[in-house]
Design a protein with these regions (language model features):
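N-terminal glycine-/charge-rich "phosphate-binding" loop or analogous flexible N-terminal tail
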Residues: 1-51
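Residues within well-ordered alpha-helices
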Residues: 8-12, 59, 83, 160
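Short secondary-structure boundary/capping segments
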Residues: 13, 34, 63, 85, ...
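Hydrophobic beta-strand scaffold residues
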Residues: 20-23, 94, 171
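Short gly/ser/thr-rich secondary-structure transition/capping motifs
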Residues: 22-28, 52-55, 128-136
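Phosphate/diphosphate ligand-binding glycine-rich loop within oxidoreductases
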Residues: 41-125, 140, 144
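Rossmann-like dinucleotide/phosphate-binding beta-alpha-beta segment
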Residues: 136-171
């Protein structure tokens, strides 16, 4: 649904001519999506519950409508949109795409922390709109030696903690 994580996946599958790949969008009418889903062997969806309409969450009801389905894959590490027990019962394999972008996400989180702490966006906007801006209003905070709170210490959370500790001697 909606996007490929990377175009190489579609390119490789198209090269084999062994697959009929159908790209669906969640805003398409169900008269277009369900005929494709009902005959599919594989189904790739987002992993965040709030990004996928409920009728496309893979659960027992969904699997009854898609009896040929043998594999479900989610974007990212999670599989909140997939009922693992229902898939097991139906014989459908579940896979996710964990870890591929973990370093990039951890670095992005660190960049956001720096941007917020140093008031970079606010200062940039003021500087562009007002030639007489007072830079003292945008001094920000140093990160060195501070205590950081991280919610969740999975792969990404642990990497953020490592970066904070190594780069800024944060606790």
């Amino acid at each position: 649904f909606n996007r490929w994580q990377h175009s190489i996946g579609q390119e490789l599958l198209n090269e084999t001519n062994a697959f009929d790949i159908r790209f669906l969008k969640t805003d398409m009418p169900e008269t277009k999506t369900w005929p494709a889903i009902e005959t599919s062997l594989g189904f790739q969806i987002g992993s965040a519950r709030d990004e996928l309409p409920l009728q496309y969450h893979v659960n027992a009801k969904f699997l009854k409508r898609a009896p040929k389905l043998i594999a479900v894959c989610t974007h990212g590490a999670g599989y909140d949109t997939v009922d693992a027990a229902a898939c097991t019962e139906a014989g459908a394999l579940i896979c996710n795409q964990t870890g591929k972008n973990g370093e990039a996400v951890a670095e992005h989180a660190l960049g956001m922390m720096l941007s917020l702490g140093k008031k970079i966006l606010e200062a940039d906007r003021r500087m562009r709109s007002d030639r007489e801006w007072d830079r003292n209003q945008f001094m920000g905070q140093d990160m060195l030696g501070k205590t950081v709170g991280i919610v969740g210490l999975g792969n990404i959370g642990r990497r953020v903690a490592e970066l904070c500790s190594q780069l800024f001697r944060m606790r």
